[in-house]
Amino acid sequence: ATPARLRHLLTLARDAGVNMLRVSGTATYESDAFYALCDELGILVWQDFMFANFDYPIADDGVRVLVEKEAAQVTGELAHRPSVAVFCGGSEIEQQLAMLGLDPELAQGPLSTELLPGAVAASGSDAAYVTSSPSGGALPFRFGSGVAHYFGVGGYRRPLSDVRLAGVRFASECLALANVPDDDADWDRGVPADAGADWTFADVRDHYLAEHYGVDPAGLRRDDLALARLRRVPARD
């Protein structure tokens, strides 16, 4: 995104009360402009290293050298940023092993417990370090301890009360809900969905819209006035 676009989006986030953004290990490192704007706007950053889901062959000398260079470069560029509050070893690495029925401690090898935290310490950063997101507790995906990925209100369509009743201590990943789109036969072609799931994230949004507001999302798409009232914007002519 351009600096102007970044400023627009991050200002919207700040004005909405967002106080932390996570750069996930499934993505890519952000631009200098992103971190500078987070510094300026007072938005904290949870920064994953770009590792996710896999068992990385860190014992291989060639791989280790590349990872050491990457970690040193990333921490060297971000250690001075007041917005960077957390460095994390990656996304769902410990969870992946646990979901396969393996001991999640097998994922706590030299990559996440030695090399990456060592790079953070060597950079002089005082940011917290977390081995993986999620992590903590007997199983990394349990909510009662450590860092959680919570989708109870979301993909699992739990009632809204579950947000409080599930006992989530800290959610570094959860499902946000979008507004209802216009009625367009092609609108849902790009709607994301988990592989193998029989629902899309639009279905999740519609479920909670109906539950919380008592309205029919499909009907809203055909009623411009009702849709405008829900969005709190003037209806189009």
Language-model features and meaning:
Residues 33-34, 98-99, 181-183:
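Short, solvent-exposed loop/turn and secondary-structure capping segments
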Residues 24, 106, 161:
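Short, charged/polar micro-motifs that form catalytic or ligand-binding hotspots
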Residues 1-54, 64-86, 201-237:
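Active-site-adjacent substrate/metal-binding segments within catalytic domains
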Residues 40, 46, 56-142:
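Active-site neighborhood of glycoside hydrolase catalytic domains
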Residues 47-52, 147-163:
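Acidic, His- and aromatic-enriched active-site or binding-groove loops in soluble protein domains
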Residues 87, 118-121, 157-237:
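Substrate-binding clefts and catalytic carboxylate motifs of secreted carbohydrate-active enzymes
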Residues 27-29, 51-53, 91-95, 135-137, ...:
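Solvent-exposed loop/turn segments at secondary-structure junctions
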